Amino acid sequence: MKLSFKGKSAIITGASGGMGLKISEKLSNNNISVLMLDLKSPNKDFLKKNKNCQFKKIDVTNYNKMKSCIEIFYQKQKSIDYLVNTTGVLWFNKDISAVDINNDVWDKVFQINLKSMMYLSKIIIPKMKKNKFGSMV
């Protein structure tokens, strides 16, 4: 039995590099409409090759902008079937002592790595429930 993903859609955070870029490519190659979210743009050739991908430059720590961007995608696609959170940063040495971490840096890392996932869940889960389908990674 061959799986069909026709008509499915996905949102990928941290989508312009590493794991996020590879996942976006794989999903696009399986006919899934992909909304790529990141602060940096993917290579222009990537978007030309992967016609099922669209990119939006966005700060994942800005709840209102995320909600607006996702709502536009949802209205067009009529569903959000998959959410893949690959956003993550480490802006200090992994071996640094907790007493030496700058509080402002730690707050921003926490917002990006954890708070953004909660924001996305809060925005997307109700849409998945409405459509009685969804998967988050």
Regions found by a protein language model. Name each.
Residues K8, S79-D81, M128-V137:
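Active-site loop of short-chain dehydrogenase/reductase
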Residues T87-K94:
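Conserved NAD(P)H cofactor-binding loop of Rossmann-fold oxidoreductase domains
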Residues K57-S68, N103:
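The beta1-alpha1 cofactor-binding region of Rossmann-like NAD(H)/NADP(H)-dependent oxidoreductases
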Residues N30-D45:
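Conserved glycine-rich Rossmann-like NAD(P)H-binding loop of the short-chain dehydrogenase/reductase
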Residues S121-K122:
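A short, exposed helix-loop element centered on a Lys and neighboring polar residues
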Residues K94-A98, N102-D107:
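Substrate-binding pocket helix/loop in short-chain dehydrogenase/reductase
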Residues S16-G17:
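Conserved glycine-rich cofactor-binding loop
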